[in-house]
Amino acid sequence: IDLRAGDYEARVATTGATLVHLRRAGRDLVIPFDAETTLPCGWQGRTLVPWPNRVAGARYTYGGEEYLVPCNEPETGSALHGLVGWSDFQVVSDTAGEDDPAGEADVDDVAEEAHEPLSDVTLELSLPASYGYPWALEVSVRFALDAVTGLTVTTTATNVGAAVAAPHVPGAPEAAGEALPAPYGVSAHPYLTRSVPLDECVLTVPAATVLDADPATMAPAGRRPVEGTDWDWREGRAVGETS
């Protein structure tokens, strides 16, 4: 799916709600790949739901119950980057033309009718409940290009209900007879580039705190101020200046 706005252009693949390339005035802003003929490098450009990073040991405890999720990184024994990275999302477009009565739209038809390129597209996926993650989610990822501000990606997930396990299956996601809220995290995995050596790039992150992770479980271990640490990027500095 190709998007354009001003000098910006992007391509999105439905598998994994993946950003395939992003360019401005012909210059790559992320490392591109050919989604039609090649597999990406790792999780390149993909949407990571319902967790980013690694679940150590491919197991986690939530609401007093332990759940096992598929291990897809054998070298670390971890469950990496969620459950939707290789799933095929459905396309919905609200850029041009009216919404399809069935809730889906053919992007090519919409663009042809509008006689102009698309500037945004929304991809949707229903993630069914499973034993390792017994919550059903409706996931929506919107990619929107603007001629001034560039690319905005908005990911929304709705918990449409926890699946109560059968009596012979332990670990039903219930507490005091009520379904627990779904544990959830989200991230994206683009590989940024500016056609210059990484160490020369200036990085600015307007964050006052950093989230530490437990080295054994990789679970969040609390936040701390970045001031006085190597994690303070608020003023912007060259990547090569940090250890």
Name each model feature, range by range.
Residues 163-168, 174, 179, 183, ...:
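Active-site/ligand-binding surface loops and adjacent short beta/alpha elements
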Residues 63, 70, 74, 79-80, ...:
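Structured soluble/peripheral alpha/beta segments that form catalytic or ligand/cofactor-binding pockets
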Residues 6, 16, 54, 83-85, ...:
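Residues that act as N-cap/strand-start positions at coil-to-secondary-structure junctions
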Residues 95-118, 159-180, 212:
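Intrinsically disordered, low-complexity terminal tails and inter-domain linkers enriched
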Residues 10, 125-167, 171, 178-184, ...:
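Acidic, contiguous internal or C-terminal segments within carbohydrate-active enzymes
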